Amino acid sequence: MRFSLITATLGRVEEVRCLCVSLSKQTFKDFELYIVDQNEHHELEDIVRNFEKNFIIHYIRSDVKGLSYNRNIALRMCKGEIIGFPDDDCYYEVNVLQEVNEAFSSREEVGFCAVTTRDTVTKRVCHISQKAYLYKKDVLKACISYNIFVRKNTVMFDERLGVGTYFSSGEETDYLYSFIENYRTCGFFVDRTAVYHPANNADISKVYKYSLGFAALQKKDWIMRRNYKAL
């Protein structure tokens, strides 16, 4: 199966290079990377030129700021059977795509996979699941955008949620909720590899923004999906 990996980026250069280095070392080679560049500068173009000989890169410039909006640009274009959303400041262990591919290939009933995450500095585990199979109630604890992979589908990100909007978070949880309910599917947790990402610093401004996103997510889940258990 081919992977389509989508990275919407703003304000980072060396971190994107680090991500590309990790992708160039993947043991599983059938993938493409979509970089949606929201920067006013063109520094990422050098990185694209340096790595496009190693794997397929689609470079897209966007004048609109917003994580969900720009992920949706790439979602409309991607060709792979499996979609992933690596952040512009994360990187993969060398066997991430291999392990995820094997998980999907051996479990036709699974619609999405989540991978263990570790902090880039301390290497401590941040997201893990003691359960092999994941359901909607497990998403908040086990899943975050950069550790999830989904079978190709028609669900799009809610552009009212996520970084660059008033509700600065919750977009990946909302995406998975919609995917699980629309396709009546479950997930599988892959614990034999890891994605590395800086641990979030819980400063007041971030907590406030994340709280707004979480509140919006819960309200949407209650009203639109009639999930009264969320209250």
Named regions from a protein language model:
Residues M1-K25:
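N-proximal low-complexity "stem/linker" segments adjacent to membrane-targeting elements
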Residues C20-R61:
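Acidic donor-binding segment of Leloir-type glycosyltransferases
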Residues S62-C78:
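Glycine-rich, basic loop-to-helix element that forms the pyrophosphate-binding segment
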Residues I83:
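Short aromatic/hydrophobic "clamp" motif used to bind/position activated sugar donors
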Residues N95-C126:
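Conserved donor NDP-sugar-binding/catalytic core segment of glycosyltransferases
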Residues E159, C186-V195, V207:
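Catalytic beta-strand/loop signature of glycosyltransferases that borders the donor
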Residues V163-Y175:
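Acidic donor-binding loop at a coil-to-helix junction in glycosyltransferase catalytic cores
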Residues D203-Y228:
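Catalytic core of nucleotide-sugar-dependent glycosyltransferases
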